[in-house]
Amino acid sequence: MNFFLSSRWSVRLALIIIALLALIALTSQWWLPYDPQAIDLPSRLLSPDAQHWLGTDHLGRDIFSRLMAATRVSLGSVMACLLLVLTLGLVIGGSAGLIGGRVDQATMRVADMFMTFPTSILSFFMVGVLGTGLTNVIIAIALSHWAWYARMVRSLVISLRQREFVLASRLSGAGHVRVFVDHLAGAVIPSLLVLATLDIGHMMLHVAGMSFLGLGVTAPTAEWGVMINDARQYIWTQPLQMFWPGLALFISVMAFNLVGDALRDHLDPHLVTEHAH
């Protein structure tokens, strides 16, 4: 609440947008006016009216219903990416920082190799190796981002592992896992969440881009990238078909980026998060 009240108006608006997106993603399946996958050819390419607030697409599907349903798919995909990449970052980075030695050296050499390439290129490469489909796209995006999270966790753990409370815990017989959970996780997670919030926008663009190219979510499932791809051939005659999912993606990415920047300034102003996407 203090963060909300002390933030700029733009950040407050972004937080409201994110809350609204989360609400739509969680509840839209119960109040959509139309089935987002229902084909109605006699109603194809209709302009916005009282029955179809945003019009219909080339198959007569209600664009508003598809846009709301796509929110759930897009946000759900990104949350799955974040959960996986945070887990990898905590486990790999925490292990490297606490164990040290050859484990640390080997882990960081692998991380450096991953960090050499832009995450977008790595994501496409991973999809080429794993195959198409939403699950593989989620895994690919997580694998292209884990090194940044692992390196951050490792740096924070190294800076804390010689503190008196950590040494006392080790002397009492606590293992690496116990030391990390009891004493280090609380110091690591805030910085990790800042980086995660800053990365949500990039991940949303990656998921939408993969789906646009037919590598992730595929038709008839409603997803913003799929909707933009479906609307390509009608861009000159029915530009609103592409405008609505593009606007939803733009607003979502901007909202998460604004909140991420504000969180970084609020929690960790010295956090370095510049990495190649």
Swiss-Prot record:
Side of membrane Cytoplasmic, spans: 1-12, 100-120, 205-207, 261-277
Family the UniProt entry places it in: Belongs to the binding-protein-dependent transport system permease family. OppBC subfamily.
This protein's name: Nickel transport system permease protein NikC
GO terms for biological process, alphabetical: nickel cation import across plasma membrane
Side of membrane Periplasmic, spans: 34-78, 142-183, 229-239
Chain's gene name: nikC
NCBIfam families xrefs: nickel_nikC, PRK10417.1
One GO cellular component term: ATP-binding cassette (ABC) transporter complex, substrate-binding subunit-containing
Species, as recorded: Escherichia coli (strain K12)
